[in-house]
């Protein structure tokens, strides 16, 4: 993953084979330095248990001065869930939750595979919504707010690059859906 601060320019060269470039941006102040964070330099965490075990690679967090961004990748096992228990980061209640928009870019192996994502708000939310999306290889979902769990179809590994943007820039400052938080203790 490459971080390019506001006001900077970089040139990317493909050495060989295919290349896929995903660009995510947020308003930020100029400053800091461009950084290349290699896969083996990302913070690796195995999260969850049972059928909601996944591997999370955090490339951009407190390791570099990245203005308003936090970014990484989540690898779901075939048939596995992630962002579980469902969580959100859309209200200002530091240090436990800070508002951050998020975007997911999905990759599925094998390419004909798919998964599902639900994005929803808490009951009683005055501007509430509840949306379910079939996600396939190359799809992008913007998450301006709400809880947002993901599941991979059996037989297909589902990975997604995620980028968070917000003033708080605190990884882990989210709230679990209280209706589903019990799975952490089960």
Stretches found by the model and what they are:
Residues 1-15, 26, 134-155:
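Conserved metal-binding segment of the jelly-roll/cupin
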Residues 1-52:
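Hydrophobic alpha-helical segments and helix pairs
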Residues 27, 41-137, 152-186:
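Active-site region of the double-stranded beta-helix
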């Amino acid at each position: 993953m490459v971080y390019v601060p506001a006001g900077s320019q970089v040139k990317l060269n493909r050495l060989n084979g295919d290349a896929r470039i995903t660009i995510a941006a947020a308003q930020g102040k100029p400053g800091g330095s461009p950084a290349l964070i290699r896969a083996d330099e990302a913070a690796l965490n195995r999260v969850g248990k049972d059928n909601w075990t996944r591997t999370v690679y955090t490339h951009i967090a407190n390791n570099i001065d990245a203005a308003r961004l936090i970014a990484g990748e989540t690898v779901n096992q075939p048939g596995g869930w992630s962002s579980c228990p469902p969580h959100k980061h859309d209200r200002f209640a530091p240090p436990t939750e800070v508002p951050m928009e998020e975007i997911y870019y999905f990759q599925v192996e094998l390419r004909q595979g798919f998964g599902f994502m639900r994005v929803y708000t808490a009951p009683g939310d005055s501007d509430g919504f509840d949306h379910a999306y079939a996600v396939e290889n190359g799809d992008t979902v913007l998450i301006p707010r709400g809880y947002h769990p993901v599941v991979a179809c059996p037989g297909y590994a589902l990975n997604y690059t995620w980028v968070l943007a917000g003033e708080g820039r605190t990884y882990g400052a989210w709230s679990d859906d209280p209706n589903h938080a019990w799975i952490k203790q089960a």
